[in-house]
């Protein structure tokens, strides 16, 4: 059976503007870390996302290293975007971030421009998207 979102979803959540961007975000966002790794079923992930969206949560937050394994959360959420959220992409705010070790070699870590651009390209590929609403860099404390 196809997912039909709650028609009252936007009356149940308060939304606020994000700085001067004009972007409205719900007071609650859904982070897709451990619950969206390969250790959980896609059905469980779909149920979590449907419940969140039915309650007015429109912002889904990911990162290049969310899983396990790293990258799995983006890949799994990408599957949900093609199925349950296929007709609702314009209603979603999708963010991702980078900043942790992801691949071998001198460019798979930390915060260089090269790393951030490569990481974003890989995230978009895993998500099956041309763009995300925003991305940011999370840097571990450098001693």
Give, region by region, the residue ranges found by the protein language model:
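Active-site mouth loops of central-metabolism enzymes
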Residues: 33-42, 104-114
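Active-site-proximal loop/turn and secondary-structure-junction residues that shape catalytic pockets
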Residues: 34, 64-66, 98-102, 137
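Short, acidic/polar
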Residues: 41-52, 111-125
């Amino acid at each position: 059976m196809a997912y039909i979102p709650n028609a009252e979803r936007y009356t149940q959540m308060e939304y606020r503007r994000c700085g001067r961007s004009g972007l409205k975000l719900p007071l609650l966002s859904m982070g897709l870390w451990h619950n969206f790794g390969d250790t959980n079923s896609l059905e469980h992930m779909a149920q979590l996302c449907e419940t969140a969206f039915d309650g007015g949560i429109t912002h889904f937050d990911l990162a290049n290293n969310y899983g396990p394994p790293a990258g799995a959360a983006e890949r799994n959420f990408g599957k949900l975007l093609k199925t349950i959220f296929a007709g609702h992409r314009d209603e979603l705010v999708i963010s991702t971030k980078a900043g942790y070790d992801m691949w071998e070699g001198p460019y798979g870590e930390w915060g260089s421009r090269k790393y951030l651009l490569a990481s974003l390209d890989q995230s978009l590929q895993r998500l099956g998207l041309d763009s995300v609403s925003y991305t940011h860099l999370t840097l571990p404390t450098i001693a």
